[in-house]
């Protein structure tokens, strides 16, 4: 099973964060009241969702490596995985949302959908194909119950 990309999702997230900071000066911005608090909230929420979901993988003694989904040994469906099939990527998106709010939000309207599209096409869909091969009907039922993002 080959993924459509060889760039780990945390690296993709960092690249998008750099683009948000770099391009934020070239786009109009909205100065929200309390933007520092709102942005910190989303950044911390993103870290919490990402790392608590990764901890679920460790508790189940299965791989957290997004580049090797075929090494997954257990289907994780508890914690944040009850509400989204991809809480770690959702956490990364929340982190980028926090950065976008801090940088005036408008630039995020461009980069956040690009991040979702990129991660979905190059990472999530190949991971789902690997999970279908490994877990079959169990993963199919999980896909019917729980949405890809939220």
Regions found by a protein language model. Give the residues of each.
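Membrane-anchoring alpha-helices and their flanking helix-loop junctions
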Residues: 1-78, 90-150
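Generic transmembrane alpha-helix motif of multi-pass integral membrane proteins
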Residues: 80-83
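Extended, alpha-helix-rich binding/interface surfaces that flank or overlap catalytic cores
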Residues: 86
């Amino acid at each position: 099973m080959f993924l459509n990309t060889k760039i780990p999702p945390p690296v993709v997230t960092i690249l998008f964060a750099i683009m948000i900071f770099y391009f934020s000066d070239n786009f109009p911005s909205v100065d929200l009241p309390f933007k520092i608090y709102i942005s910190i909230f989303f950044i911390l929420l993103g870290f919490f969702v990402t790392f608590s979901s990764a901890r679920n993988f460790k508790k189940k003694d299965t791989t957290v490596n997004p580049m090797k989904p075929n090494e997954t040994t257990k289907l994780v469906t508890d914690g944040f995985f009850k509400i989204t099939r991809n809480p770690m990527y959702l956490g990364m998106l929340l982190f980028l949302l926090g950065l976008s709010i801090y940088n005036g939000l408008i630039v995020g309207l461009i980069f956040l959908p690009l991040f979702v599209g990129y991660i979905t096409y190059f990472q999530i869909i190949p991971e789902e194909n690997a999970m279908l091969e490994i877990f079959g009907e169990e993963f199919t039922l999980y896909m019917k119950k729980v949405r890809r993002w939220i």
